[in-house]
């Protein structure tokens, strides 16, 4: 039997391209090579596509995915040249141009099956403001927040924050993930510098009420009505808040899987995770991040439609705890991608 082709897209234009490379390398090593041939394409910061490598067997430990200057020495190709009949694409891309619906729309134009969120679920979960409106509509609790826009009167924004929230607050670009551009603000004097930092990444910003809470996450997997969520896991931090460096560079986090929470609280988070996932028409996978306060209140922080996917990332570790190995998880995601593709093709008039 001939092998299936799995195409890995990695790199990308966003500030999170380094995370993408780490995730793609983990997938490259964990793939079931008795079923798949893996072809890899690097997307440069400028958005150009480069075919880098092809693997028919598990690569040696010292073999790495080509990136940056080395990858850019290879010839650039037309983005549409990645097309291969019956191939499945795994877009291991994070942030803008990766999990905001852009690459998903491109792959649908090419009529390729792909792992992960569809256009709607990617774009709606990537936009923190839009996601908040959706979650409010289905009754999933969230912390209080204020929306800010770069072209608005910043003094009026500050006044609204003072009236509606209490310090500390967290300032977040509306369209960015992996804690890029996020600042913790302890008093009014530090609000404007934090807004200026966030506006570097997006002209729309969310200012959220800080809460004294544990950060607990559930992994979600499935399509349509057949969706399941894991027992929650907890981020245990050695830093004040979970920023980009602590996540991916400084290794200052640990994870408790499963999280030490009462069974009824774990069930509540699983129910909220599935409700939020279905509300945004989730496909494939997502990670739902919650705040849990000392008095047992649960708040959905965000849905991450393409969560970090290294072998030490929370998402695959949560499923491993449920008995689904990293390699089997990849195969399940490919099967879900093919299912979504077939459904989409059958619905075209």
UniProtKB/Swiss-Prot annotation:
Q: What is its EC number?
A: 6.3.2.4
Name the positions where ATP binds.
162-217
Q: SUPFAM superfamilies, per this entry?
A: Glutathione synthetase ATP-binding domain-like (SSF56059), PreATP-grasp domain (SSF52440)
* Keyword list, A-Z: ATP-binding, Cell shape, Cell wall biogenesis/degradation, Cytoplasm, Ligase, Magnesium, Manganese, Metal-binding, Nucleotide-binding, Peptidoglycan synthesis
Stated family: Belongs to the D-alanine--D-alanine ligase family.
Q: How is the cofactor bound?
A: Binds 2 magnesium or manganese ions per subunit.
Output this protein's name. D-alanine--D-alanine ligase
Question: Gene name, please?
Answer: ddl
Q: In this protein, which residues make up the domain named ATP-grasp?
A: 132-335
**PANTHER family associated with the record:** D-ALANINE--D-ALANINE LIGASE, D-ALANINE--D-ALANINE LIGASE A
> What start and end residues bound the annotated signal peptide?
none
Annotated Mg(2+) 1 binding lies at: 289, 302
Q: Which GO terms describe its molecular function?
A: ATP binding; D-alanine-D-alanine ligase activity; metal ion binding
Query: Cellular location of this protein?
Result: Cytoplasm
* Catalytic activity annotation: 2 D-alanine + ATP = D-alanyl-D-alanine + ADP + phosphate + H(+)
Q: Which organism is it from?
A: Lactococcus lactis subsp. lactis (strain IL1403) (Streptococcus lactis)
**Lineage of source species:** Bacteria, Bacillati, Bacillota, Bacilli, Lactobacillales
Function of the protein: Cell wall formation.
InterPro entries for the chain:
ATP-grasp, ATP_grasp_subdomain_1, D-Ala_lig_Van_CS, D_ala_D_ala, Dala_Dala_lig_C, Dala_Dala_lig_N, PreATP-grasp_dom_sf
Enumerate the cofactors the protein uses.
Answer: Mg(2+); Mn(2+)
